[in-house]
């Protein structure tokens, strides 16, 4: 068409449009500023597509070789910093196509045969996320190992256990740390589930309805390492469930990290004093010279909002979209990329913190477990073991605690005579049973905080994580 638009991304539809884009609209419409993140995946997908076209007789073998060589040259240029797309390219797909045509000539125009940017970007995103999921899994394993190393060192260390942030019962410190290892394992399992649904190939669905070109979708999917192809072309190009699923799984990772971070922040305070932060993982105040601030866990706690926000943004983006592809989908990438980066950074930060950034203060922990009423439940258990109904024992011990508070003393400071005045079932072995270490040891039920049970779990997790490393 005379006077048509030429050059850049607009060249792909130049015969339809007579005027160029308004400069602001061109910038507003472009995604090249962030979707260049998908360059390696775009090249991988295009190479597999070119080879498939040749295997199906759509293009000649020598043309496929030219295309693949050109795409690999673009990869080299990118690594050397010589591939520099501009705003006129609009997105990574047009940037690659433009450069490919410049390198190999008109044969480069055949690469897009049998596909659309709609199925192309869906493929790129899935390839990208599949790799990132594997990386995050490795990071989570690292954090698990850091926690496990601390747990191994503190199998005989005790810490107050809390409910409602009130001291409840003494625990083995290793047991407390193992709880977070369990949470992180569920996170790994969830991310693994996401990976299974990410690993389905949309390439070949074209714009929305498939293509009359005789392609082999399964060949391309296999070459790219996908386990299956989408059965419905409309679903293939419009599905962003996997972005939401990843953001949801990442949000749970962040929630768990935030819980751990909050405990470290509290433990590092003078009010608790359970941990001492390393200079390598803390900062000072610009005004108060005595301060050592827990910036790492505070930032982790704060960054939760970013990942949670991306989940809400993605859900809101897709909720009203008709089939099939809509430009709204351009908004999935920055949310997905940032959710990944933020989550991975926070996992690494917490791993470093537990590897070399904090030290548990055993003296303060011992002082804490020996200076409260967290052994009150064990007094009730003592009576129950001697035939007293639990509810009666519970009420008796509650009255004893009140009496101790009035007299400003602890349970273990009451004499045997005072205990016998409360109930004749109390004997001389009571004081031994109320010692914090005895209280912890008594929790022998499976999954409990008893030292022997905790040792079993430490050994089990050492074996599990060793197998994960090998796998």
From Swiss-Prot:
Coiled coil: none
InterPro entries xrefs: Arg_succ_lyase_C (IPR029419), Argininosuccinate_lyase (IPR009049), Fumarase/histidase_N (IPR024083), Fumarate_lyase_CS (IPR020557), Fumarate_lyase_fam (IPR000362), Fumarate_lyase_N (IPR022761), L-Aspartase-like (IPR008948)
Enzyme class label: lyase
Cellular component per GO, a single term: cytosol
Superkingdom classification of source: Bacteria
Reaction(s) catalysed (UniProt annotation): 2-(N(omega)-L-arginino)succinate = fumarate + L-arginine
PROSITE patterns found in the cross-reference section: FUMARATE_LYASES (PS00163)
Similarity comment: Belongs to the lyase 1 family. Argininosuccinate lyase subfamily.
Alphabetical UniProt keywords: Amino-acid biosynthesis, Arginine biosynthesis, Cytoplasm, Lyase
Name of the protein: Argininosuccinate lyase
Keyword Amino-acid biosynthesis: yes
Pathway listed: Amino-acid biosynthesis; L-arginine biosynthesis; L-arginine from L-ornithine and carbamoyl phosphate: step 3/3
Localization: Cytoplasm
Biological processes per GO annotation: arginine biosynthetic process via ornithine; L-arginine biosynthetic process
Organism, as annotated: Parasynechococcus marenigrum (strain WH8102)
Predominant subcellular localization, coarse grouping: cytoplasm
Enzyme Commission (EC) number: 4.3.2.1
Sample GO molecular function, one term: argininosuccinate lyase activity
């Amino acid at each position: 068409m005379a006077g048509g638009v030429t050059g850049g991304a607009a060249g792909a539809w130049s015969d339809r449009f007579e005027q160029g884009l308004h400069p602001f609209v061109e910038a507003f419409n472009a995604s090249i500023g962030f979707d260049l993140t998908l360059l390696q995946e775009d090249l991988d997908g295009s190479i597999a597509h070119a080879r498939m076209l040749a295997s199906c007789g759509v293009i000649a073998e020598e043309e496929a070789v030219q295309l693949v060589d050109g795409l690999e040259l673009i990869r080299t240029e990118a690594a050397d910093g010589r591939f520099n797309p501009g705003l006129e390219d609009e997105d990574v797909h047009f940037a690659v196509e433009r450069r490919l045509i410049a390198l190999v000539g008109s044969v480069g125009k055949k690469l897009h045969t049998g596909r659309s940017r709609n199925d192309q970007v869906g493929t790129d995103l899935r390839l990208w996320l599949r790799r990132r999921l594997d990386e995050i899994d490795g990071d989570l394993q690292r954090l698990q190992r850091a926690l496990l190393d601390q747990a191994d060192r503190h199998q005989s260390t005790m810490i107050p256990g809390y409910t409602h942030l009130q001291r409840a019962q003494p625990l083995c410190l290793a047991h407390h740390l193992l709880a977070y290892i369990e949470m992180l394992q569920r996170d790994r399992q969830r991310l693994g589930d996401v990976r299974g649904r990410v690993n389905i190939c949309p390439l070949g669905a074209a714009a929305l309805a498939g293509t009359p070109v005789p392609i082999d979708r399964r060949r391309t999917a296999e070459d790219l390492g996908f386990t299956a192809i989408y059965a419905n072309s409309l679903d293939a190009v419009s599905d962003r469930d996997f972005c939401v699923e990843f953001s949801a799984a990442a949000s749970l990772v962040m929630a768990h990290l935030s819980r751990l971070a909050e405990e470290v922040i509290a433990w590092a305070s003078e009010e608790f004093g359970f941990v001492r932060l390393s200079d390598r993982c803390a900062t000072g105040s610009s005004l108060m010279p005595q301060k050592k601030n827990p910036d790492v866990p505070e930032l982790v706690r704060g960054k939760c909002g970013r990942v949670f926000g991306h989940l809400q943004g993605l859900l809101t983006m897709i909720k009203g979209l008709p089939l099939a592809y809509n430009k709204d989908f351009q908004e999935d990438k920055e949310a997905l990329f940032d959710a990944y980066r933020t989550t991975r950074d926070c996992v690494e930060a917490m791993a470093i913190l537990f590897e070399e950034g904090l030290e548990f203060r055993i003296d303060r922990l011992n002082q804490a477990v020996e200076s409260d009423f967290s052994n009150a439940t064990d007094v009730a258990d003592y009576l129950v073991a001697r035939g007293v109904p639990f509810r009666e024992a519970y009420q008796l011990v509650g009255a004893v605690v009140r009496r101790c508070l009035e007299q400003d003393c602890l349970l273990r400071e009451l004499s045997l005579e005072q205990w016998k005045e409360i109930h004749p079932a109390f004997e001389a072995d009571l004081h031994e049973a109320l010692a914090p270490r005895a209280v912890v040891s008594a929790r022998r039920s499976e999954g409990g905080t008893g030292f022997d049970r905790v040792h079993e779990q430490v050994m089990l997790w050492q074996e599990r994580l060793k197998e994960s490393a090998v796998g």
